[in-house]
């Protein structure tokens, strides 16, 4: 099994952790943006089937 030769420095570990956090942040931001555009009906990249709210009599 491969074993690292030296310990990773604290600064390098912090940089990698921040990059990992930022990827999640941007993914969440894109998801919220898409949800907002779908809810307002302004989405150009996501197709939603519209349902009618007619009352059955």
UniProtKB/Swiss-Prot annotation:
| Keywords for the protein's UniProt record, in alphabetical order | Chloroplast, Plastid, Ribonucleoprotein, Ribosomal protein
Q: Does the keyword Ribonucleoprotein apply?
A: yes
Q: Which InterPro entries match?
A: Ribosomal_bL32, Ribosomal_bL32_plant/cyanobact, Ribosomal_zn-bd
Cited Pfam families: Ribosomal_L32p
Any one GO MF term held by the record is: structural constituent of ribosome
Which stretches are annotated as coiled coil? none
Keyword Plastid included in the entry's annotation: yes
Which domain of life does the UniProt lineage start with? Eukaryota
- Could you give one GO CC term from the UniProt record? chloroplast
Q: What is its main location?
A: plastid
Subcellular location per the Swiss-Prot or TrEMBL entry: Plastid, Chloroplast
Q: Name one GO biological process term.
A: translation
> Which PANTHER family does this one have?
50S RIBOSOMAL PROTEIN L32, CHLOROPLASTIC (PTHR36083), LARGE RIBOSOMAL SUBUNIT PROTEIN BL32C (PTHR36083:SF1)
- Family, per entry: Belongs to the bacterial ribosomal protein bL32 family.
Listed name of the protein: Large ribosomal subunit protein bL32c
Top-level taxonomy: Eukaryota, Viridiplantae, Streptophyta, Embryophyta, Tracheophyta
Gene field: rpl32
């Amino acid at each position: 099994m491969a074993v690292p030769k030296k310990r990773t420095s604290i600064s390098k570990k912090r940089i990698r952790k921040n990059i990992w956090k930022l990827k999640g942040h941007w993914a969440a931001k894109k998801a919220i943006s898409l949800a907002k555009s779908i809810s307002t009906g302004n989405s150009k990249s996501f197709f939603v089937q519209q349902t009618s709210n007619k009352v059955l009599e």
